[in-house]
Amino acid sequence: MTAAWTPRVQARTFDEVTAAIRRSRAAARELRVADCAERDGALLAVADALESRAIESAPRASAAELRDWAGTPDPLGQTLREEQRRDGARMRQLRVPIGVIAVLFDDPPHHVLRLLGPLLKAGNAVLLRAARHHHSAAETLVDIVREGLATTRIPSDAVQLISSEQRSSLRYLITARGDVDLLIPLVGPGLRATIIPEATVPLIEVAPGKGHLYLDATADPQLAEDIVLLCQTQPTGSGLTIDTVLVHPDIAAELLPRLDGALRRAHIHVRGDKAASAVMPDWGQVEDGDWATIHQQGQLLVAVTPGLDAAVTHIERNGSGHTELIITEDRRHAREFCNRVDAATVLVNTRPIADTPQHRSLVYSTQRLAPRGPLGPTELTTTKWITNPDRDISHG
């Protein structure tokens, strides 16, 4: 038996928003007991609906990613710890869904479709709130998603859209503790500055990545060139966010002209500090405030830094805690860089290629508490303890 489907369910008024949250709560209860085959079937059905109805290529690409998530291991029911009490009872800590997750977003809706894979795979109901200028496109895409869900055993209310621009509705959404279990605000700095201090619902802080690539004295020039170009030409939203290169002075005179040629061919605008500009006079000059700024793709900053200590200090001052890289043949320097740099991801002598569904995730948490890094289904779960005296009666 398939779930009932109501097209174009729009939550625009305050009362409609509260009703949508109640429906999400009910859907979350059904998702809690849905098995992996049912959740995977829902992902595949949504992918089919997107491919058959979507006109643009971006939603079809999102459909392919949904199929990828359907082929990943089930995050639910995994035993994390097992203990035995003195009375002989056995205790197991299992992964379970979080419940209702609200995603607030400013990006085009097809970007947020990429989140549906891990969210539904982890058994969560999803409330989407789009920016005003994306309402029409979001309504169309969510309608397609719900149509796909209606052919499965997963309720179509597992995915709903909130279109209300009323401040009272937004405030209710971010303070509906107990009804909404988690917020993921994919919004600009202005709205983020409002949401984070006012929200009583737990949230995952998502910051745009500002990563650094440190080229140590023993860096492989070809690998350095490849990684710089990759990070500057990768598709938008892929999470590869290196826009500052730090170069050891021993290799600056040889490496910077080589990088300049490759970057010019790729039409990438480069600015350098005084030391870098002394080697490459045609480069623009970096202002002091530029180092901590998130720059658009196709813009690169270069600094000549006197060694590992200076590079780590620069990263601590200007990084966002997203992704940091080092290229070096010195194992001690590699180990020290990994230990000292505070970031969700640290890479050594490797291209940051997002070749798994999780590392292609749109959402990358840079907060101190877990989850940190790319958000896959496992990171979008919580846990429960189940205790029984002599045999396992859980369905996990």
Predicted regions and their residues:
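N-terminal alpha-helical segment of soluble enzymes
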Residues: 2-64, 304
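C-terminal segments
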Residues: 2-8, 14-26, 72, 329-396
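ALDH superfamily catalytic-core signature
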Residues: 5, 11-15, 106-107, 121-122, ...
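Flexible, glycine/charged-enriched surface loops at secondary-structure junctions
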Residues: 36-41, 153-159, 234-242, 267-275, ...
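Active-site cofactor/substrate anionic-group-binding motifs, chiefly glycine-
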Residues: 59-120, 337, 347-350, 361-362, ...
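Rossmann-like NAD(P) dinucleotide-binding subdomain of oxidoreductase/dehydrogenase enzymes
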Residues: 79-222, 253
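NAD(P)-dependent aldehyde/semialdehyde dehydrogenase
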Residues: 249-341, 345-358, 362, 374-375
